[in-house]
Amino acid sequence: MALNFNQYATEGNTFLKDYAKEMNMPNDRNKAGRVFTSIMHALRDIIPTEESLQLIAQLPMFLKAVYVNGWSIKKNKPKIKHMAEFLDLVRAHDGSAAVNDFEYSDEVAEQYVDTTFIYLRKYISLGEMEDIRDSLPKDLKSMIYSNLMF
């Protein structure tokens, strides 16, 4: 199997364009990319490593790269039990851009999380989404549960 990096770049750019449109930020793909990356990295931090590996197996190459970039597998995962804590973790992954990207609003941040998981259903099977949901704390299950059937 030959690696076709031009194809991965094209697919990644198409994904980002479509995702930015879905997130109602069609003219700011940089922001959309930061938001997506922050949400994926926060998810990666709280689900078991085995579940991350199963998720990665279903992602296209250009999303695998986003997911694993900077990943350091830790035995002690952050203790995130509530949506507000998850949103704080997402913002932490976004760094100094979080102030502008999430507009100081949990409502905006939660909408971005919901939209991201709906959008990910294009790439991730229902069974894998259920497995991810099952690995989440009770108060976080709704970020995937309410979006499973899309």
Residue ranges and their predicted role:
Residues 18, 22, 89, 93, ...:
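Residues that form generic nucleotide/phosphate-binding pockets
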Residues 1-49:
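The feature marks the first
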Residues 1, 5-8, 56, 79, ...:
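Intrinsic-disorder-associated interaction segments
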Residues 26-37, 44-53, 103-115, 119-134:
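Short, low-complexity cationic-aromatic patches
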Residues 46-79, 124-150:
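Extended intrinsically disordered, low-complexity coil regions enriched in Ser, Thr, Gly, Ala
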Residues 13-16, 63, 94:
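Extended amphipathic alpha-helical scaffold segments
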Residues 67, 71-124:
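Short, solvent-exposed interaction modules
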